[in-house]
């Protein structure tokens, strides 16, 4: 037990995952209406925008490492906060939502408001397809 606490304490010294940055929003995605924008914020923006709401567990290793990695990868793939109508990955995002890959189940287990119904997924897919550059 003591050894486990010592290891847990030592994990907190690893600096990766400490820094939680939300760069400025340059250009937000053009959602067709506020309801779809809210749906996207709930299901996508934690990892795919510069508007991440960093939960408490994202400050504690090893979860901080996983959350930081997910956000970095998500922003690299598709970032709704630096939207470029000519160069975006909306078609890939639509496919991922349609195939049930996004949002991932490991995320929706902790954030049930991001778990999309079939109708919500269809609405989000249609909006993403309409925004494809």
Predicted feature locations:
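Hydrophobic membrane-insertion alpha-helices, especially the h-region
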Residues: 1-15
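C-terminal region of N-terminal signal peptides and the immediate post-cleavage residues
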Residues: 12-24, 53-54
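Electrostatic cytochrome c docking/interface patches
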Residues: 19-40
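Stable alpha-helical elements in mature extracytoplasmic
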Residues: 32-36, 43, 63, 67, ...
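The canonical Cys-X-X-Cys-His
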Residues: 40-51, 102, 124
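Acidic helix-start/capping segments at beta-turn-to-alpha-helix junctions
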Residues: 54-69
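Extracytoplasmic electron-transfer domains, predominantly the class I c-type cytochrome c fold
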Residues: 65-111
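C-terminal capping alpha-helices of c-type cytochrome domains
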Residues: 100-101, 108-133
């Amino acid at each position: 037990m003591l050894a486990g606490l010592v290891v847990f304490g030592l994990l907190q010294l690893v600096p990766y995952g400490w820094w939680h940055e939300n760069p400025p929003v340059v250009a937000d995605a053009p959602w067709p209406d506020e309801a779809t924008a809210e749906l996207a914020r709930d299901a996508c923006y934690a990892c795919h925008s510069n508007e991440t709401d960093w939960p408490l567990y994202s400050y504690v290793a090893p979860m901080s490492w996983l959350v930081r990695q997910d956000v970095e990868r998500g922003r690299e793939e598709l970032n709704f906060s630096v939207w470029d109508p000519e160069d975006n990955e909306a078609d890939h995002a639509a496919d991922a939502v349609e195939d049930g890959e996004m949002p991932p189940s490991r995320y929706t287990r902790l954030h049930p408001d991001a778990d999309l119904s079939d109708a919500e997924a269809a609405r989000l897919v249609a909006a993403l397809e309409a925004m494809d550059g």
